[in-house]
UniProtKB/Swiss-Prot annotation:
UniProt organism field: Ralstonia nicotianae (strain ATCC BAA-1114 / GMI1000)
Gene Ontology annotations of biological process type: carbohydrate metabolic process; peptidoglycan biosynthetic process; UDP-N-acetylglucosamine biosynthetic process
Cofactor(s) the protein needs: Mg(2+)
Record-given protein name: Phosphoglucosamine mutase
Family to which the UniProt record says this protein belongs: Belongs to the phosphohexose mutase family.
Note describing how the cofactor binds: Binds 1 Mg(2+) ion per subunit.
Function: Catalyzes the conversion of glucosamine-6-phosphate to glucosamine-1-phosphate.
GO molecular function: magnesium ion binding; phosphoglucosamine mutase activity; phosphomannomutase activity
Length: 447
């Protein structure tokens, strides 16, 4: 069933434009509240309570107030955490035994975008069925709760402290970060007052950048999607590592002392190696269609099965649950360790990488010795709306030729964009010139 508002990661858009307007968000809070209330009544749980967290965008205040009004109008109690990473909201929702959690964030997008994302009582993303129920409720007229049945709202002061302690609890008790200097880039986002405490309290010397949010500078020149300042600061301070999070701190990028950047594909490999070195069985891991082939081949050579999900951490999570595995991720830095947290968490992922390095006594470069990422060439080709690339004869003929010639030493991925009339042509090969050659040949058939 197609949905009108919910995408693969909640509802997102430009602030002030539908659907990210205060009137719609109020109705959204009411609709979600009605669905939660019906569920609570059916299970005899009484009045539901939700947690609302947000990142540091200026529009967060406006949307928080609208959500609060909608939920309380539906008879739902509300707790508000203030700025808190998305995975922090997921954790507290589960830890406080709440009915649901809501995050106001547009992740790595600029400040003028925002979004709404829901978590279930278990800290997981809402099932499609529940999102569809909320959309159906949005189409109905609002019927407010009686005056004596309205919800109550209050702020909780210890949300950040609770989450800091939870993050630290995922780091092995017999390890510490004494003697390490770490640069942290919080993207002027939700981790700005969280991440420095986590790593400092575990013993590291911390240098913080991207930690002065003003409501309009989130992700602007800082964070996981713009690592140049992290690379510069890591070199300048002679740090052992640099860690970058995005605006809501659910993704991670890492820089070593030489300024080399490590993406999520490589970090997933590091986490698998750490488990195997500790004697833990790792039957398989999940990446995406975009995960570098070198990582897949390296894992398979060690007997670790590798499955590719559609792009998006939601789909990685689905595959992990289907196979009963624990570790997955994508190159953008969304990493999942399901025995540590129910959702992707940049801080916790960083701690797992650090634990691997401390336990082994190796650097990232040493752990990844022998894993040489294949060069990738990506070309975006504009096409007519509704274009079916699978029925394009010239493209299919060129595709057969390129796949035959690559013959296991590379791969081709062709997929349409989900947001614009574009077909993405990506070729991966051990030789960069070869990747470019085949990508250009394939793209030329569409031009």
């Amino acid at each position: 069933m197609s949905r009108k508002y919910f995408g693969t990661d909640g509802i997102r858009g430009r602030v002030g434009e539908s659907p990210i307007t205060p009137d719609f968000v109020l109705r959204l809070g009411y609709a979600a509240g009605r669905v939660l209330a019906h569920g609570s009544e059916a299970h005899g749980h009484g009045r539901p309570t939700v947690l609302i967290g947000k990142d540091t965008r200026l529009s967060g205040y406006m949307l928080e107030a609208a959500l609060e009004a909608g939920f309380t109008a539906a008879g739902v109690d509300v707790l508000m955490s203030g700025p808190l990473p998305t995975p922090g909201v997921a954790y507290l929702t589960r830890a406080l035994r709440l009915s649901a959690g809501v995050v106001i964030s547009a992740s790595h997008n600029p400040y003028y975008d925002n979004g709404i994302k829901f978590f279930s009582a278990t800290g997981d993303k809402l099932p499609d069925e529940t999102e569809s129920q909320i959309e159906a409720e949005l189409e109905k007229p609002m019927v407010y709760a009686a005056s004596d049945a309205l919800g109550r709202a209050r702020r909780i002061d210890d949300a950040a402290g609770r989450y800091i302690e939870f993050c630290k609890s995922t780091f092995p008790n017999d390890l510490n970060l004494f003697g390490m200097k770490i640069v942290l880039d919080s993207a002027h986002g939700a981790a700005y007052h969280i991440a420095p405490h986590v790593f400092h309290e575990l013993g590291a010397e911390v240098v913080s950048i991207g930690n002065q949010p003003n409501g309009r500078n989130i992700n602007d020149g800082y964070g996981a999607t713009e690592p140049a300042k992290l690379i510069e600061a890591t070199r300048q301070h002679g740090a052992d590592l640099g860690l970058a999070f995005d605006g809501d701190a659910d993704r991670l990028q890492v820089v070593d002392r030489n300024g080399r950047l490590y993406n999520g594909d490589e970090l997933l490999y590091v986490m698998v190696q750490a488990r195997r070195a500790a004697g833990q069985a790792v039957p398989g891991a999940v990446g995406t269609l975009m995960t570098n082939l070198a990582v897949e081949l390296a894992l398979k050579a060690q007997g670790v099965e590798f499955v590719r999900a559609k792009v998006g951490d939601r789909y990685v999570l689905e595959e992990l649950k289907k196979h009963g595995w624990l570790l997955g991720g994508e190159g953008s830095g969304h990493l999942l360790c399901l025995d540590k947290h129910s959702t992707g968490d940049g801080i916790i992922s960083a701690l797992q990488v650090l634990a691997a390095l401390r336990r082994s006594g190796q650097t990232l470069e040493q752990v990844l010795d022998g894993v040489h990422l294949f060069p990738q060439k990506l070309i975006n080709v504009r096409v007519e709306k509704g274009f079916d690339w699978k029925a394009h004869a010239a493209l299919q003929a060129a595709l057969k030729v390129s796949e035959a010639e690559l013959n296991g030493k590379g791969r081709v991925l062709i997929r349409p964009s989900g947001t614009e009339p574009v077909v993405r042509v990506m070729v991966e090969a051990q030789d960069a010139a070869l990747a470019t050659k085949y990508a250009e040949q394939l793209a030329a058939t569409l031009q």
